[in-house]
């Protein structure tokens, strides 16, 4: 009888151990965790491109202001014919760029027979999901301009563009929708 009782207890312990081990399952909880919707916007991206001509580089101090990923305005001198940057910021976000200009020290535009203001820009802004899928509206534009003027007209032209020759600014809401805004 003792042997039978011991065998029954051992069998019960074995069965309880088996039930406990199979009841735990795997440590992989990812199967039950809901995955984020791939259409939920999480960030805004803005790709910028600016170009300028030789006359502008030689006569003017050119400064680029843009919003960085932290929402702060950064400033960079433009010392080459082209400039490109891509900024990614967590939503909601403000993204934009502006090209400011002033005469270089000692520059005398009136002494020039002709000044050519050649410049171009493009931008492409959009919201992305966690998997970098484009969601929301896309904002983009671009143009190339060439304006020839007599040297004595350069100062007046600069005065008309004190707040920036090229400027655009967009506010991206938490839902990924972008609306245009103004530089202050």
Regions found by a protein language model. Give the residues of each.
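Bacterial N-terminal signal peptides that target proteins for export
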Residues: 1-10
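Bacterial Sec-dependent N-terminal signal peptides
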Residues: 4, 17-46
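Short, surface-exposed binding/anchoring microloops in extracellular/periplasmic proteins
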Residues: 34-67
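Hydrophobic beta-strand segments within beta-rich accessory/binding domains
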Residues: 46-52, 92-111
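Tryptophan-paired
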Residues: 67-104
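Exposed low-complexity, polar/acidic, P/S/T/G-rich flexible segments that act as propeptides
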Residues: 109-130
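C-terminal partner/receptor-binding element of secreted or periplasmic proteins
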Residues: 138-184
């Amino acid at each position: 009888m003792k042997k039978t009782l011991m065998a029954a207890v051992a069998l019960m312990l074995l069965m309880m151990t088996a039930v406990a081990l199979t009841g735990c399952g795997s440590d992989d909880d990812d199967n039950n965790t809901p995955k984020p919707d791939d259409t939920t916007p999480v960030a805004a991206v803005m790709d910028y491109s600016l170009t300028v001509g030789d006359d502008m580089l030689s006569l003017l101090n050119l400064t680029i202001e843009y919003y960085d990923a932290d929402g702060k305005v950064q400033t960079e001198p433009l010392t080459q014919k082209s400039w490109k940057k891509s900024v990614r910021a967590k939503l909601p976000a403000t993204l934009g760029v502006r090209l400011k200009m002033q005469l270089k020290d000692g520059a005398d535009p009136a002494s020039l027979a002709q000044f050519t203001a050649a410049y171009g820009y493009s931008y492409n802004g959009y919201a992305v999901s966690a998997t970098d899928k484009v969601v929301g509206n896309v904002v983009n534009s671009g143009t190339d301009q060439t304006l020839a003027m007599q040297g004595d007209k350069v100062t007046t032209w600069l005065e008309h563009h004190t707040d920036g020759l090229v400027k655009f600014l967009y506010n991206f809401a938490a839902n990924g929708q972008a609306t245009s805004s103004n530089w202050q």
